[in-house]
């Protein structure tokens, strides 16, 4: 009897090995699949949150300039309205670029909440617009740039730097209009379709911010 028991144990052993092998194989492939899925998952970072925030800000600035355009036309300041159209298009391009970058990371941009804007006279809107641009150029984007540098997010870093340059130009155009009391000449505004930089001259071959060809700029 003792001999038979030993034989039974030996015979059952290969089956146990087979079952264990199958189990280990399944566990291995399951683990590999999880690892692959984890690699595809984008880990949340402050820069990604900043992209959502910047997208919302740019969309609200776009809407703000559209409202300011209507007010300038009402106040019979057509040239100021033309400036606002160019700035509105510029902000729209900024927002679209933030969307593209988020989607390239497989992240769907959040729907931005509308910011209430009080629309005064055309002259008042010029001062309000300049204040907004100075905050973005002097405070918001420098902070976003520092974070992108720390988190080693080169694409976001480059995008933030380019938009900061574009916003600096916005401020320059608005200061000029304010200094003249809104009495600005009729200008042909050129907006870079790649980064939203605004020019008032064609006496250059490339965009100062993103190096795109001026020949491809949108005429406003």
Mark where each language-model region is.
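Bacterial N-terminal signal peptides
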Residues: 18-27
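C-terminal motif of bacterial Sec signal peptides marking the signal peptidase cleavage site
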Residues: 29-31
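Non-heme di-metal
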Residues: 33-220
